[in-house]
């Protein structure tokens, strides 16, 4: 099964990396809820300071007009969602936003461009942007789509730290969500990213009418990447009018928390990011996610083109929960 053997480079699997079959991951999902969260908390505390939360800001630097048909995405040119197309922004505008993000406590600045994949001329400008943002002392992450040969090396040379390229969903569910690319296309780009020496940010979306077994398949696919991703964003579907998944069945909040917990247990050393969908989550649900091992959030009122909790609200929630922004000093217990 594809989800069970997903090496993204030629490195021999490290003996300390546990192999996760879909059945084994599914069994984790079926663990009694509080027991599962408790186990995830124990794993989390072995590798991270449970009070430290990595704050990241995500900015859309090229918006809309994407030729892909991802059923969840309001930036697809195939759907009428009201998103206004915007060409690649100027360096100065992006740097100004990055400075604001840093002043507000973000340690990581993520940039997203709605392309199937960048062209060589796009990479020239993107590398200029990365250099400028990196000079501010921020960690940098980019999500620009499928990469051609040599592009990952160019991004690395410019100073990019992480490349985000999500698997989105389980291999078995992939064709139900996306028809313009294959699951293997994602793995190919991830391989190029690893070969270039970049860190990998790779996660998925839940709540897209997948079954629990397919959620287990997504987590197994991520956990069996070799090496495991340094950063794993777990997104809850944001239903946008005009997209095919606008009427997707609502996912129970406990199932989302289970997904966070299972991600933490199977990928103990990865950052598990509580990503899209937080604006629809209660404070109590977010608190359970942090208890279950989430230790990173996107900080700012927008995630590309969808809403995110306001920064003041996040600061208040973190204060209520006695959480603090991650720094080099408080990273570990």
UniProtKB/Swiss-Prot annotation:
Annotated positions binding [2Fe-2S] cluster: 110, 141, 201, 273
Q: Where does [4Fe-4S] cluster bind?
A: 66, 70, 73
CDD domains linked to this entry: Radical_SAM (cd01335)
Does the keyword S-adenosyl-L-methionine belong to this entry? yes
Q: What job does this protein perform?
A: Catalyzes the conversion of dethiobiotin (DTB) to biotin by the insertion of a sulfur atom into dethiobiotin via a radical-based mechanism.
The record's note on quaternary structure and interaction partners says:
Homodimer.
UniProt-recorded name of the protein: Biotin synthase
